Amino acid sequence: FFSSRRRHTRYPLVTGVQTCALPICYDVIVLDAFSGGSVPVHLLTREAFEVYAAHLKPDGFLVVHVTNAYLNLYPVVMRQAESLGMGVRSRFQEKDPERFTRENIYMILTRDQKYLQSFPSVDPPIRDAAGRVIGARALDIPGVGLWTDHFSSITPLEWRE
């Protein structure tokens, strides 16, 4: 954040969760607040996603880094995309100890049909005992309700150990 200010970049970096902090309209909004131990639920509600969508250009992208130490947040974001009529593509990044990266899952929400038709999802692989890819792991879970400012439940979510 501070280094981008020193470099006088031409791309504004908006921090904070205040909805009034977001000017209209962005090409891309990135949510990256879920990789720790706690989940800021207020950022995953219908009302929050309506604000994000209102500040996107019609063909804009909402990128959500859903990697979390304990919970599979993919179905929560999927329900939000469905409620907004947005398409979803997922991007999985395998861990790479040499590059000091860990496994990450990103969800890209958009109404841009050209993008949705051109780029398939990249989901986490399922590997056999020899390490060969034999399929892709499904990330969505049926039965997870739409989170709102008045309702959210982690009970149906997949827990990680």
Predicted features and spans:
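Redox-cofactor binding/interface segments in oxidoreductases and associated redox assembly factors
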Residues: 30-31, 64
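A short glycine-rich, Lys/Arg-flanked "PGG" loop and its adjoining helix->strand segment in the class I
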Residues: 44-58
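A short acidic, Gly/Pro-enriched loop at the edge of an enzyme's catalytic core
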Residues: 23-30
